[in-house]
Amino acid sequence: MGEGPNNRSRVRRLRPFIAVGAAAILGAGAAIGVTAANVANASPTLAAQLAARFPGYHIPATVSKALYDHSSTATPIKHLVVIFDENESFDHYFGTYPYAANTDGTPFVAKPGTPKVNGLYTKITPQGPVGPLLTDNPNEYNPVRLTQSEALTSDQNHADVPEQKADDGGKQDAFVQNTESSTPSNGCGAEYCPPGIVMDYFDGNTVTGLWNYAQNYAMSDNDYDTAFGPSTPGAINVTSGNTSGGYAADANDTSTPGVKTTDAGSVSALGSDGTGTIYGDIDPFYDECSDSNHTTTSPEGVLTGPNIGDLLNSAHVTWGWFQGGFAPSSTNSGGAVCGSESELTSNGQDVSEVQNYVPHHNPFQFNATTANPAHLPPTSLKEIGYTDQANHQYDMSYFADALDGTGGATLPSVSYLKPPAYENAHPGNSDPLEEQQFVVSTVNQIEQSRYWSSTAIILTYDDSDGWYDHATPPVINGSDDSAVGDTSVCTSVPITVGSAEDRCGFGDRLPFIVISPYTRENYVSSKMIDTTSVVKFIEDNWLHGKSIPGSFDAVSGSIDGPGGLLDFNIPPHYAPVILNPTTGAVVRGDNWYGNQGKLKQTATR
């Protein structure tokens, strides 16, 4: 047996937050300090300064709780928690599911009767999965299994056009030359990055927790990125399904805050009104922690169309976006500083300090209506999920308060969770083992809370990172933008969603797991869905099907209904399946596994 989970030191030194709560606000050439008094109840001076600095934004007034509706849903799901991780393709995590090699890492043996997936194999033999995609792949390299000691890999190229080129007209045969971006000649440090790395995959000995959730709940093998491209479009799509109506704001022009500028690498296809499509990574304008805590002056993104938060606010449904590192660690002349860091470790060694908060991963900070530029805390814990000065944007620590009922807090109807960067699975600053710590710890906490019986947890990803996936994306919305360089994958298909260019999709396949008492156990759904299906479920469950103009929600598949991941026509299974956050092994709640450690050591193939 190779390196096991107990041999991997998991030293994590989370730098303490400095409880400033809000920032010093720069206005009229002077910084205004935020005191304890106006953090608890934002002062008129603070409100005026923020309004001047961020046109269109105002600190929301606290809305009476009597207006909120907590009971009206179309399904038994009263609470949705979306864990939105980073940069993994389906084949990269589940290409050989449910077969694990069991030569290293946490042992894994699938339950009898586990369904096969649309993966890298044609059949599974006693010696393992076999098929031409594994041994005679049309790409320059065959896929190779990654061991647990190789969990920390390099980051691949996951920009819009390189992903299109990798798909090569649907042949899926040009990944190495288009999305592989790190090889030993470039220097990889502690990251594992041999030639052909973009083709490689993990199995249940490393992504053990996710495989065990698939064993006990439901997983899709037919979920796609709403559009080709990186994290920011993915984040916008999971919260609105519409990346158009955006523009780049000049962060260097303090005399006219928010004035439009150009950023061809992030915002394209500008119309006569100066707005276009956000198709690349760009930090949000309504965020004092953008541009490396305002130590640089790169353009920042603004969105003018509504998102799901706007719709939930109109319907008086509680919601929140919870992100690691959102609480400011200090202030500078530009306002809030999100400087907290955590130690990334690999194979028992400290690798690097990773900043926890990544602004361009927070989609609600692009809209004046849903932003919290100064990272203000809620006026009290009871206000979590309700409209007040925090405007539904919170540090991750507040999610634990909501689950536990600390200070009278309650769990919002809809919660999006973005882990701190070292635990978000993004190659280069995280890995599957760090991700597992966050996911399993969070799911365990939800499963053991008073909300579990009416909750659905979705685990999915913002983009594929450019990792190989053999499934040809079903492109239903095209784009023909010569300035960007769209390929025939997109130019051969008309625009069917809205009217903007550079929203070509669906993109490559992503993992999508639902954990809930209302899933079938050990179920694989092949019903086609995409990232915006999350938005569609929220609209259908809480908003009577109300949709967002120009959104993919009009064409996205449902995660419930016939063939879906949620099934309300079968008896719910309330007993939670509790996993070990470090190993991913089942520790309670699954009768088949029983004494899982003993079973799996003796039942390896």
What are these regions (language model features)?
Residues 8-9, 17, 80, 125:
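Residue-level detector of intrinsically disordered/flexible regions characterized by low predicted structural confidence
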